[in-house]
UniProtKB/Swiss-Prot annotation:
<feature type="compositionally biased region" description="Basic residues">
    <location>
        <begin position="727"/>
        <end position="738"/>
    </location>
</feature>
<feature type="region of interest" description="Disordered">
    <location>
        <begin position="476"/>
        <end position="546"/>
    </location>
</feature>
<feature type="region of interest" description="Disordered">
    <location>
        <begin position="205"/>
        <end position="272"/>
    </location>
</feature>
<dbReference type="Pfam" id="PF06203">
    <property type="entry name" value="CCT"/>
</dbReference>
<feature type="domain" description="Response regulatory">
    <location>
        <begin position="82"/>
        <end position="200"/>
    </location>
</feature>
<feature type="compositionally biased region" description="Acidic residues">
    <location>
        <begin position="238"/>
        <end position="252"/>
    </location>
</feature>
<feature type="compositionally biased region" description="Polar residues">
    <location>
        <begin position="488"/>
        <end position="497"/>
    </location>
</feature>
<dbReference type="InterPro" id="IPR010402">
    <property type="entry name" value="CCT_domain"/>
</dbReference>
<dbReference type="InterPro" id="IPR045279">
    <property type="entry name" value="ARR-like"/>
</dbReference>
<keyword id="KW-0902">Two-component regulatory system</keyword>
<dbReference type="GO" id="GO:0005634">
    <property type="term" value="C:nucleus"/>
</dbReference>
<dbReference type="GO" id="GO:0009736">
    <property type="term" value="P:cytokinin-activated signaling pathway"/>
</dbReference>
<comment type="function">
    <text>Controls photoperiodic flowering response. Seems to be one of the component of the circadian clock. Expression of several members of the ARR-like family is controlled by circadian rhythm. The particular coordinated sequential expression of PRR73, PRR37, PRR95, PRR59 and PPR1 result to circadian waves that may be at the basis of the endogenous circadian clock.</text>
</comment>
<dbReference type="GO" id="GO:0048511">
    <property type="term" value="P:rhythmic process"/>
</dbReference>
<feature type="compositionally biased region" description="Polar residues">
    <location>
        <begin position="532"/>
        <end position="543"/>
    </location>
</feature>
<feature type="region of interest" description="Disordered">
    <location>
        <begin position="727"/>
        <end position="767"/>
    </location>
</feature>
<keyword id="KW-0805">Transcription regulation</keyword>
Amino acid sequence: MGSACEAGTDEPSRDDVKGTGNGILENGHSHKSEEEEWRNGMGEDLPNGHSTPPEPQQTDEQKEHQVRIVRWERFLPVKTLRVLLVENDDSTRQVVSALLRKCCYEVIPAENGLHAWQCLEDLQNHIDLVLTEVVMPRLSGIGLLSKITSHKICKDIPVIMMSSNDSMGTVFKCLSKGAVDFLVKPIRKNELKNLWQHVWRRCHSSSGSGSESGIRTQKCTKPKVDDEYENNSGSNNDNEDDDDNDEDDDDLSVGHNARDGSDNGSGTQSSWTKRAVEIDSPQQMSPDQPSDLPDSTCAQVIHPTSEICSNRWLPTANKRSGKKHKENNDDSMGKYLEIGAPRNSSMEYQSSPREMSVNPTEKQHETLMPQSKTTRETDSRNTQNEPTTQTVDLISSIARSTDDKQVVRINNAPDCSSKVPDGNDKNRDSLIDMTSEELGLKRLKTTGSATEIHDERNILKRSDLSAFTRYHTTVASNQGGAGFGGSCSPQDNSSEALKTDSNCKVKSNSDAAEIKQGSNGSSNNNDMGSSTKNAITKPSSNRGKVISPSAVKATQHTSAFHPVQRQTSPANVVGKDKVDEGIANGVNVGHPVDVQNSFMQHHHHVHYYVHVMTQQQQQPSIERGSSDAQCGSSNVFDPPIEGHAANYSVNGSFSGGHNGNNGQRGPSTAPNVGRPNMETVNGIVDENGAGGGNGSGSGSGNDLYQNGVCYREAALNKFRQKRKVRNFGKKVRYQSRKRLAEQRPRIRGQFVRQSGQEDQAGQDEDR
């Protein structure tokens, strides 16, 4: 169906075709005068664009053939396609030209890209298709493709690339530049037969709904396409700066779309060009869709600046101010992302999404039109840089409501006096924690001193949370100000332990996240940003309160706290009284906790067997005093833990090795109060680097470790002895076979015995 000579049985015979007078002569060519007249658009008065001589009579069979031929020419009016073949190799060019002529194409050969471009510039050639090689001297195929796509007239000509290099990079580059297809050499005849489909798609798409003359419709509609392209590019350029580079880019993208946007059947070019135009073109947004300002760079990439969406509703005189406002928004966005606080516009909380316009800056543009340029800039900076009072009131009300629920929730806890600094610290804690809980990890820029803001930034960057903390036990006691959460419950009773084992009444607003998560029975994945703020900024407050030694003694039995790496603080001094005072100071930095009650409750939950075993085996070491306070509980109260230094795996695995090491280390643990304590999750690292946590709670961890080492060494020695014996036997056997091979002759690869005496002598030697 590609040409007249390939019509097959669907076409009438040559005599019938000649009789119908459609201008189709033998050999599939038409009169030159008729073809030129048809290309110049002179035959528009005729139905097919051809000269039809009148016939006096026509039979019904001839009318059917005529209708069939008219329908065929409606879709492909060109009788023979002219193909510009660009190939630098002479033999390849001749072979491909012969194949194209066999497929009834007219071939115009070109040796290189420059010659091909000269042929394209000559409009008398009427080239319908370009088949070019990728790699050529002077002007390559990709360079020729770029020239064709950028030309106003030649951009409608389909370009097919061919090359022996079929790498993905080459194909991707050619298709992205505007090629409609890519053929891999050697080229087959069947591939060349189907080249007409690209021209048919182009003519059919440009002619609208399948008009009778596709090329004439294309010539008529090309100025319309250019006008639409200019309008679209003009509207797009209003959104951007008036730079020549931007206009050129828009020209290329829209030009590709005007030429190849309708190649729905090929699936090659339209997929590349449509995306660029869809991204650049403004799309009207519905008023119901909320258009909040993006708070992340990912959102900025996915959603283009909302200014583009509002240009259809804004006057043209106001678009320049929109650009300035966009730059100010970008500056403020970078500034607030740097310090960890979001930029909040005045419209973000005041109006609902249905009441908001399509663009948050639209109302500001409408109200600020009469004002001067500097006034608009200063107003936009003020609205973007400072949180409004309505926002602060909203967050404060949320914090107060959550705090009331928290107080009602823990009203059964023992009455412990909690002295929390009031004023700006409390407001800052409530604002930051509630924004992190309700508004999704957003930090507000509050009015505080420079040192407090600096500490907050450090906290944000220094979170010790990991992906596995949510699977451990929930923090039962207070976590807000003390910098630790003593885990007083096993893993299976997280929500129950929160109700029964919480022993302090927290007055800080920073415990809202803990109460909310604890009530759901979830883990202690809380906001680490504000939980240790008081412990960091004021580490030496409330130093006078001391916990009784019985509480410290309980810590030795239960090991309820997770050991952490210790940092030196003024409260930690070597000695019995100083250690107790340091523990008390660590607890009283934030909120005092009744440690003895919580430890004893937890003792009955989990570590009863550990308590019994340690009473029998480790009673002398427990009564030694403060030297045993180093068993992992005194280190918990350091402020830089950031609120999750509790023992998250209180299932007995840590406590057994813990108490086992205390008996061996003895007084040597007291000097470790003032230096970093190297403790692991499962036990204490001894001086020789061996961890002693065995989890059984019976006996010393180091004893079992030494027994295991001895057992392994014995097994290794036994294995080595066996290997020596086995290798010795192999060595002897190999030497005897070598000697036998030298003594015995071979026939066809087999040993042949010479005499029985030699065999007997060889056997004696082997023995």
